[in-house]
């Protein structure tokens, strides 16, 4: 058996998770957000988001997706962003809405982006403003109807 030395750094966190305990990733994360509400969840560019912040912001994003945009279960939403704190908020909001997140490399060329958006059938994209020029080149060749920056 191979030694798993990294487990020493887990502290009180279990090394194994009973996957049958949760009905979804959202349920798992909602429990963590309640348990650790006041603790830092993410740090990015000098700002810290607590688990409570992530809970609140992702719930608001989910509501926006469902009520304002009409996103339904199974819809595919592209996310073209570096690893900023907005990324996990978008992920959880999309998951809470029952949609599917399609991760898009922010370094894609226009041809690569066009292919991925069309292949996945995305009509909505959450995009880092630094990547919008690439999207602007090909948006007319895709089904994208909504751009969220």
Predicted segments with their positions:
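Surface-exposed charge patches
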Residues: 31, 63, 92, 115, ...
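N-lobe entry segment of adenylate-forming
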Residues: 1-49, 53-68, 73
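Conserved AMP-binding/adenylate-forming
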Residues: 47-49, 64-111, 129
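Structural core segment of the AMP-binding/adenylate-forming
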Residues: 96, 100-149
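Solvent-exposed alpha-helix faces
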Residues: 59-63, 82, 118-121
């Amino acid at each position: 058996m191979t030694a798993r030395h990294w487990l020493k750094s887990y502290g009180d966190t279990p090394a194994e998770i009973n996957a049958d305990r949760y009905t979804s990733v959202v349920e798992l994360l909602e429990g963590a957000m309640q348990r650790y509400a006041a603790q830092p969840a993410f740090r990015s560019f000098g700002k810290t988001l607590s688990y409570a912040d992530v809970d609140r912001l992702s719930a608001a994003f989910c509501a926006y997706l469902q009520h304002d945009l009409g996103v339904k279960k199974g819809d595919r939403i592209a996310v073209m962003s570096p690893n900023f704190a907005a990324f996990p908020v978008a992920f959880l909001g999309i998951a809470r809405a029952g949609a599917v997140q399609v991760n898009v490399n922010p370094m894609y060329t226009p041809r690569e982006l066009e292919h991925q958006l069309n292949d996945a059938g995305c009509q909505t994209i959450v995009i880092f403003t630094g990547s919008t020029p690439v999207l602007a080149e090909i948006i007319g060749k895709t089904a994208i109807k909504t751009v969220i920056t």
